[in-house]
Amino acid sequence: LTGTLVQCNAEFLALSVLMQMACPGTPLIYSTLPTVADMRTGAYTPGAIETGILVIGCAQMAHYYKVPNGGYIGLTNSKVNDAQSGFETGMSTLAAVLSGVDMLNMGGLLDALLTFDFAKAMIDNEIALMLKRVKKGFDFSEENLALDVIAEVGPGGMYMDKPHTLERMRMAAFLPKIADRDPRQQWAEKGSCDAQAHAMKRV
């Protein structure tokens, strides 16, 4: 992996020199698509966790050079929009966002970039919105710390009816459109839909 990172950096530096020679001052993006092969078959594996690790390394190098960065991340080797697709996309994109990646190109791709799936694109959009929420992090302003409300409510109290909560409830937490959060009985009454079915309704 480390050698691949060296190669990525060498390619970025070479391209940067050529770009600046051709057109001085041209803005740069540290954009690479490093990946690994499955050593059992030689197959291209953009869904491998090592691809995510390489993107983290490239993001750190981009920070070192003070340029924006991004690339294809959140890809999967899964042929269908299933659990493998979800965990490969989720693991690598979360790692990338936490390492400071600026741009993700990930929408709707399956089967090592060979297939596009509309439902996967909708699910990837929801993942992207979740990642945006993660990147937003915490707001430690006096108002958001709500120390006065905590003191007022006291131990074991309820916050749901407090104006402070009501004013912020739609902004504080991400509200998904595809992920199901209903209790089981309501979920069953609505047709027991999985994420794929919910996504297809939104296509």
Task: Set out the residue ranges of the language-model regions.
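Glycine-rich anion/phosphate-binding loop at the beta-strand->alpha-helix junction
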Residues: 1-127
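Catalytic-core signal marking the mid-to-C-terminal active-site face
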Residues: 119-203
